[in-house]
Amino acid sequence: MSSLSDQLAQVAASNASVAFDRKKRQKLHSASLIYNPKTAATQDYETIFENALGALQELCDIEPRFQVFSKTLFSETSITIDRNVQSKEENKNLDNAINAYLLMVSSKWHLAPALHATEWLVRRFQIHVHNTEILLLSTLNYYQSPIFKRILNIVKLPALFQPLSNFVKNDSNPTNITIIKMFNDTDFLKLYSNYLSKCIKHKSTYTNQLLFVTCCFINLIAFNSSNDEKLEFLVPIILEIAAKLLASGSTDCQIAAHTILIVFTAALPLKKDIVVAAIETILANLKDKKAEQSAFWAVIKISQTLKGQQAIEHLPANIYKIFDKHYTWVRVLDLLTEEPSIKCDKFMTSYIRAMIRFDHSKLDMVVPLVQKLSLEKYEFRSIVIDLIHLSEVLEDKSKLIDLFEFLVKENESLVINCLSSLNLTGEMFEIRLTTSLFSKTNDDNELELLKTLNSHKNTSSDKKEETKPFKQFLEENSEFIVTSNKSMISEDDEKFNKILGLFIEAIGTGYQAGLFLSSFMTTLEARLTFLLRVIVSPSAPIALRLLAMNNISKYIQSIDKELNLFTLIPFLLVAQSGSSKNLKISVKKILGQIGNRPFTKHYFMSNQLYGEGKDIKVPSPSDSEMWTKNFIENYVVENVDISGVFIPKQAEKVFLLFWAQQVLDIPLPYPQYMILNFLGKYVPNTASYSGLFEESISSYLERREELLLRCALNKTDPIQFETAMVNLISNKEKHHFMLDFIINVLQSDYEDLIQILVDRLVEVFATFKTSNQLRIVQEILQSVTKEDQIYDALGTLQSLQIDPDTFVCIFKENSINSESDVTSFPKRRRRRSSTNKAALQSAEVSQIAEDHLKKLTIMLETLDKQKVKGSEELLSSLFFTLADFETLDQDGGLPVLYAEELLASAMLNTIRSLKDQGLTQLQNVRADIIVSAIRTSSSPQVQNKLLLVIGELATLSSEIVLHSVMPIFTFMGAHSVRQDDEFTTQVVEKTILTVVPAFLAANSENITEEIEFLVMSFATALQHIPKHRRLRLFTTLVQALGSDNSLGPLLLLISQQYSNAVKSFKISESRSLVEFTKLLLSKFEVQEQITGFRKFLELYEKLLLANKNPEKKVTLETQALFSSKILNLTQSEFCDLTNNSYDFLTKVIVDTNDDYYDSSRNFKIRLYSIILDPTVSNATRKALDESYSSVLKMILSLIADYPDIFVFETNENSEKQNSVHFIGDILEEIKQSLYGLLHAILDVLPINVFLTTTVPLLESSIDKEIRYHIASNIFDKFENETVDDHELTQSVVHTLNEKIPQEENNVAQVLLNLQSSLINKYGSFFDNNLLVEVLNLASGLISTGPRELQISSIAVITNCVSVMGVKFISFYPKVVPICIKLFNETRASKEELAPQLQLSILLLFTALVKSIPSFLTSDLISLMKLIFFSSGVEVTTRLSVIQLVTEKLDLKNVLGTLLKVWNSEVKESGDSTAISLFLSLLEGTVEKIEKKSATSQSPLFFKLLICLFEFRSQSEFDTNTISRIESSVYAVANTYVLKLNDKVFRPLFVILIKWAFDGEGVSSESITEKERLTAFFKFFNRLQENLKGIITSYFTYLIEPVNELLKRFISGDISDVNLRRLLLNSLTSSLKYDRDEYWQSTSRFELICPSLVNQLSNIEPTIGKYLVKAIGSLAAKNSSVDEHNQMMNKLLVEHMKATCSSNEKLWAVRTVKLIYSKVGESWLVLLPQMVPIIAELLEDDNEEVESEVRGGLVRVMENVLGEPFDRYLD
């Protein structure tokens, strides 16, 4: 039985869509996949259904299977279906239909119709409530799409989907890691696996879903990759899913299964039986060819996970058959070729082993398979051993020959080891296979086997049947019996091979060799020639050859002694070439036999040996004897190389020709190859004998197939054979037939032969004549144009050592333009002709042009790689080729960029090679071709390389500089410098550094104009050059051109760009131009920079004069630097340009914060370092002084001549729009810019040089405005810099003393300011007399001078006071009274300079306070007035002076003066600022005054305090302002009181009480009693807050006056809410801070209690709470005294009677409530007296009173009583 919670959950689920109220129904109805809730809530079912029906029809058009739902879920009756009233069975059917629909629609969620159709199921059947799981599962693979986020928003997530809840809250799509975590949940994984199984079963899987499933499983495996336990748990789940996917028949499903299995087995290697089962399942279910590749690699990769020997066991027969059914061996090879990087050795080893075991018909497939694989050693060994075992049982062993030849070639040692492990030797195995296999021989094994063979024992240990008789063997093979004396050397290869096979078989069977030979060859000649052929046959095993040697030795003895056996020598020589020592010994033995015979003229078989009628050209008997004996004597068995004894020196030529002829005569390829090798080793240069091979070589290609077939039949390597033939090509080859052979081979389709030829050509090509080289190269180039090239023509050419002349010939022969088109130097580059263009449009001609381009490109690649020695002819041909490329590009539209880049590289290499050879001059270089190519090329790389060519040519040909530099630099400025790459930058720099020096040297007469043109070319492109590359480029340019001539023009051009940027409000661009210019100038010496400034000013002066004078403008128009645009500017535009340019130069010179941290770009620091460096020579200093002076003079001249220079000729047409005022403003700006430039130029000088330069400029002969600015510059200089030479500053002050009286007011003011600054900074070092002189001058000026001079003079006096101190006292009467007078004059004045004058006077008094405070006592009132009423001075400044006053002056005097100033000035002023400053000074004084002084001055202070209290009645300020003032006064008073003791303060407090209550000591008749009492109680309350219980006893002086005042409030004699509140608060505070039972005194209590409680009778509602608090505090303090409690209770009851007013009763109730809440326990005894009153109040007519009693008082009493109050009422 299920638990109660489960039952409740089921009920809740079934009723999830049941809504019992309107809101819930609306919420259910508003859940939508498409619409927002508000819109969805307004829709009816009919509208939703109609929309869904249309969507379903669209789905049916896509997938007809949806039609079934039109009769169920989307039928007309579905509108009326309500699952809440249906039966359980009906709902089950409905859910099944919905689930089926969701399975089908899951692949269509990306389509709008699916969304609109499903909307009906959500709205009508609430599938988001009842079918949540299937809805989420079917859409989970869309988790990153908006639709899934929408579904999450409307469903209630089941428990297994809870990880998605966070994304519902955040309204975002789930992340990948969340999905992984969900799948990592075991329950969810099983749930989704079941769902996937349903999808597979119903064939509703689709690509997107399978991709999602695959990714999820892969991520799940990766997530648990380090958790083996989890992976083990996943095994059955994943295998089950994979099996179902594989069994589905869907290609996508199978590919998904393959992928999952690959990843899973890689993470967790499975047992072999599982792997085998998985492979069988994969292959068994493979039906669609689309899945074949995936299945193949799945099988491969799953097998790779197996470990150990079991991994390579042969495949089971059933799996092999299935695999073989799906994959032919050709298909397997193709798949392995497609993915060569994938390891597949384990499965393929198993597959090969299965093939060896089960399918012998496919043994031919083993070799190509093994070639494709990278097998481990143990895998290779397994295959070899299987094949060795197979050789025992396989009848047709010829199938294994090629296979074992390959295996031996791959790893001979391993094969031999495998044989040894099976107790077999290589020699025995060769006999078994009837072929020769091994190059490594074992001499002992050979001899042992030979003995065995000679002893006629059976060598075949594997024979199980009895050997058949030889006679039977002979009869079976009687057709191969030879009865003639014909030579077997010339016998047909197939017949010989058959006889050889029979011979091996016979020997292997155990028949006697002699028996076989005599039986199958009846003549001696046949037997001997057969054996000779055996010993030179590569297919014959070593043991057989040894046996043949023995028999040859025997047969020789049977030959007539008169026959010369020298004809056998070639075969013996070839036979000894192997590695077998025994074979060599046998050869030497036979040679000995031959040498012991007579050397007659009758040679054995001389006309039969190589064929009937073929005479053998043999040496004379004497030569043959000499050769034989020489060879035997010098032949060493251990020697591998016999070339040293191959041809004797005595008859070298004879035997050289003899052996060469043998190659031609012997009809066997292997001996031919071996003899050629012997010849090649002896004579590397084959020219001496290669002529003999003319016929053979000439016909070689025709006979090649026949020769290669013979090689195959004789088991001769065709590559080695052809290599030997090709090696006949000699160094310096001259034979035409050989050259024809080379050409014919290159034209052939024989790739292997061509490669052999190429390898030989690489060795000998360099020795060929140029004509022969040219012929070969032309042929190779011709093959380039073929679509299907047999060999790598480019690689071939690049590997050949081609000489420069050959390249020249090639380029000339492949030229399009005739030399007459391009060699006529005075002509410019020909233009593109329409004729060429039309011709190249032809398809045939176009193809020829493409082939031509391809050839040239190949040659250029070759030339670029080989780096051949350069020559002028080669360079010239490259120029012609460049012209051809331009024709192909411009006229033919062919892609020549790559070829041009190669050509440029080749030209560079050639030029550099010529330079290395010492060449210094080139003639007739066509620079215009390069320039044209640069201009027309669209490739920056080509352009850059051609620019490098220009640079390299610059030093070898002045012609290029003279005729081409301008277009080159124009191009660089327009294009190259704009490229943002390092290579282009380096190219441009290198071009500049190489071309410019040559250019300057060639144009010494007109150098300035040319320099300006080049600078303009680059400066014009400045804004287009990447910012990080500008500096290096322009630095290189200026250095190359020379800074003296180029820096000024460059500054001029940059200043124009700066002006344009400023006018266009491009602030960042203008700032970057200034920064760039600074950085550029920092790369040059200071002298160079100053020269550049001078040139800049000179150029602008020319512009100014040209704008003024039309004749000079015409002159400038010829200069490249002054474009017509600048010269034709309107007057206002030119003024703007001039102003901005001067401003630009100023900013360049002036240092900024960035310059502070980088001294290299700080012009000022670098100038200092030269001027102040003692190591700098005088000549350098002098040159610098002259340059700097010239710049300064030019600026001063411009300023002085300003009115004349800046009067322009007005062009009426262009100046109509410019008003006179506008031009005047611009001219004024120019003037100020010039002054700014002057200031910048002067400011960078060291102070001593600066003064030496500027002081003379103050002479009166100079314009006063200039003097003014010079004086300002001097002032700024001293302000910003420190001077160590104090004599210098004194002299300056002295000079100023003399100059000031003579100057105009504005200049004199600046000089006075300068004097003030100097005295402030260096006055302490000045002589006292000098300061007296200054004071005399200044004191005179303050009384007689104008205001500005008065201000500056006072500043001078102020600084003198600071320096002189008390010594100033003699000037005190002269200065201070006048300053006070000046202040009084300006106090009410509205002069413009009044604030500055007030400030200067205030600062003077500040200095006096600091320096001579004691002398200021008499003028203290004036000082305070100055502080309080200097309205033009900032308040903060005056506050600082106040602080200084409180620190420096005697505070007793200050306090007395404050009282006087208050009464005399401040209180009557009505100036809030003055009052605020007065209070600040008072506060500061009180805070800093000592207690002793405070005690002595306390009467004075309290007198001032009373005056301040009375200010309320005298002021016209608003109440808030007065309150703030009084608050400050109370704070000050409290601070002062804290400095007094009780003995001093009590009398003063009594005075205050009498003033407040009795009016004693009142100084203002206008103040009222209420105001006095208000002021007092505010002060007293603040005092109580600060002093707390210390002054509780002081209430003794107040208790009676307060009692009287309370009574007056009761009687109504006085009425003031604020005063009453203050009074009540004072009582509360006193009660609060009472720590000495002061208020428990009966006398005080009985005095104050009635008056206080009776306040209830007429208390104002606004302050009732203060009264309640006061009474409550009094009750709390006296709660321990019963009599006091009774008294207060009685008084309170009187105010709670029915006859009392409602307000009175209300506050009385609240008071009682507060008392009971505080001290209820003490008042419980009084409760019976209170009950009747409370009962009455509970029935009170006033609701507020009743509510307060019922809700407040009664509840408080109940809390105290601990029981309901109703009990007392009952």
Curated annotation (Swiss-Prot):
One of its GO terms (molecular function) is U3 snoRNA binding. One of its GO terms (cellular component) is preribosome, small subunit precursor. It is found in: Nucleus, Nucleolus; Membrane. Its main location: nucleus. InterPro entries: ARM-like (IPR011989), ARM-type_fold (IPR016024), BP28_C_dom (IPR012954), HEAT_type_2 (IPR021133), HEAT_Utp10/HEAT1 (IPR056473), U3snoRNP10_N (IPR022125), UTP10 (IPR040191). SUPFAM superfamilies: ARM repeat. Signal peptide: none annotated. The chain crosses the membrane at residues 499-519, 528-548. Keywords: Membrane, Nucleus, Repeat, Ribonucleoprotein, Ribosome biogenesis, rRNA processing, Transmembrane, Transmembrane helix. Belongs to the HEATR1/UTP10 family. Component of the ribosomal small subunit (SSU) processome. This is U3 small nucleolar RNA-associated protein 10. The lineage of its organism: Eukaryota, Fungi, Dikarya, Ascomycota, Saccharomycotina.
